[in-house]
Structures are given as C-alpha cells and as structure tokens.
Amino acid sequence: MQYRLKVVFVDNEEIILEHTQKHGFSDDLELFEVTTADEIFVIPLKQIKYIACDSKIFKN
C-alpha cells in the first residue's frame, strides 16, 4: 500500500511524500526512515517538528 506522508521540519520547511511505502524509526531512535516508490529518506529526528500521514494505513 502506498500513502501520503508529510514531514515538517523545525525550521517550518516541509516535504510531502506521495508514494510512501513504509516509515519508521531507527533502532537507536535517532533517525526517521521513509521508503517511497523511488527513494529512501533518512532524517535525523532532531530536525523534525512533526509527522503526519494518511489515515488509510490504519484501516486494517
């Protein structure tokens, strides 16, 4: 399943990823990892203000 994920950074810049396949935190809880159909993003948690995702991923 692909869904939309929005990441807002502490400097109020944002990125919207339309074709997210999965997301989660690294084992040490310092990185946020996002896999899309085209790319893999690894973002330090200290740079993230908040994360929002499409609610359809919770409908199972």
What name fits each language-model region?
Residues 38-60:
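Short, mixed-charge low-complexity intrinsically disordered segments
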Residues 11, 21, 36-38, 55:
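Short, well-ordered turn and helix-capping elements at secondary-structure junctions
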Residues 1-31:
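N-terminal acidic leader/helix
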Residues 28-42:
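Short aromatic-glycine motifs in intrinsically disordered, low-complexity regions
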